[in-house]
Amino acid sequence: MELTTEKLTTWMTLFAQKINDNKAYLSELDTPIGDGDHGNNMARGMNAVIESLNDKNPTDLTTGLKLVAMALISKVGRAAGPLYGTAFLEMAKASKDSADLAQLLTVALAGIKKRGGAKLGDKTMVDIWEVLTPEVADNSLTPEKIEQAVLNTKDLEANELLI
């Protein structure tokens, strides 16, 4: 699937809505190992993403992806901002050569792994991205596969060096 500026805006709008709808739950999940503010941080970041996309109305994908990255880096605290920001910066760089979503997600995942040092099995976002990115490439991603990927992380033990 080709990612366009319009699809990026729709994706970010839907993602922002999900984050805002679930920010209390995300903060609750963060409480045992963090400071319980992940939902609020992500909501603040995604609201900034939407504001930036609406204000600047990018006409090309690279610019749109950079706007997303910069909003996340500047507004989301702790590790999530730099990790998501890196993902979107890597996508922005790669989008100069390709708008293929699977390719963009692959470089985003590589950026996340390099930035955070996580690997499969560390109970991080890498455990989801690593499993589901190939599903995007195969055009076989389903809600059931997403749910299964999430469930598969439930009993993983978090790598304490990454907390």
Per-segment meaning from a language model:
Residues 1-163:
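N-terminal loops that bind phosphate or other acidic moieties
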